[in-house]
């Protein structure tokens, strides 16, 4: 007797269509289109999780550079001075200081001033 895939197929289709909620038109309703779109969206999600890290780092660099230029120095000189002075603050923290707590950023800048 031939084995049919009725229950298995139904479960698989339901799983894919459930994940495809929020897609437009046939990409939500039709299994094949939904599966194709789901593969593509998973690829985008994987790729962009990596890209997000790059984008945030460049945003932090821009913010630190803007704060440094307000105090007549450049980003690269400031980062070099931090390294020479042995200050271990990462770019995320420095950017947050530059945006929200300028006095703290200025104190860090003063502490590495001799290494500039």
Curated annotation (Swiss-Prot):
Domain of life: Bacteria
CDD domains xref list: Ribosomal_L20
Functional summary from the UniProt entry: Binds directly to 23S ribosomal RNA and is necessary for the in vitro assembly process of the 50S ribosomal subunit. It is not involved in the protein synthesizing functions of that subunit.
Gene that this sequence comes from: rplT
GO cellular component, one term: ribosome
SUPFAM superfamilies xrefs: Ribosomal protein L20
Cleaved signal peptide residues: none
InterPro entries, A to Z: Ribosomal_bL20, RIBOSOMAL_L20_CS, Ribosomal_protein_bL20_C
A Pfam family per the record: Ribosomal_L20
Keywords per UniProt: Ribonucleoprotein, Ribosomal protein, RNA-binding, rRNA-binding
Record lineage: Bacteria, Pseudomonadati, Campylobacterota, Epsilonproteobacteria, Campylobacterales
Gene Ontology molecular function, alphabetical: rRNA binding; structural constituent of ribosome
Designated name of the protein: Large ribosomal subunit protein bL20
S-S bonds: none
